[in-house]
């Protein structure tokens, strides 16, 4: 929510400060499952190993959404580094700043045998 608290330029898009997101446990569960899948199966993608999209995974977890977005990251060892990377990336920044999103669930998972070691997922939703 700190990133949303002030106006931002995300690539060529300008965003006003956005309202804080509300934590959603269902989105957090879906985010944790995706992070764990990426870590344990050593891949990095918005689609899971079964080809499910973020919207598919949110629905499977029980989240009924009008709008879903997702940011993923890998290898960063702190939340600050992850968010800084997302703010610097136009598409990820646009998800963070999108005023239509109302809820957030996020998680990370670690597998030292994977290429990146740690995998992060943030899921944004509008019920």
Model-derived features: positions:
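Short, hydrophobic secondary-structure boundary micro-motifs
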Residues: 13-16, 46-48, 95-96
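Disulfide-stabilized extracellular recognition modules
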Residues: 65, 69, 73-127
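Bacterial peptidoglycan biogenesis and beta-lactam-recognition machinery
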Residues: 10, 40, 44, 92-94
């Amino acid at each position: 929510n700190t990133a949303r608290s002030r106006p931002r330029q995300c690539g060529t898009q300008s965003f006003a400060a956005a309202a804080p997101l509300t934590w959603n446990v269902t989105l957090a569960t879906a985010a944790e499952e995706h992070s764990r899948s990426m870590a344990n199966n050593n891949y990095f993608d918005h689609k899971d190993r079964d080809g499910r999209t973020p919207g598919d995974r949110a629905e499977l977890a029980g989240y009924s959404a009008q709008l879903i977005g997702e940011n993923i990251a890998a290898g960063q060892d702190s939340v600050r580094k992850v968010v800084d990377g997302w703010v610097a990336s136009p598409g990820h920044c646009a998800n963070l700043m999108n005023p239509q999103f109302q809820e957030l669930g996020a998680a990370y998972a670690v597998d030292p045998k994977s290429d990146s070691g740690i995998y992060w997922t943030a899921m944004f939703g509008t019920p």
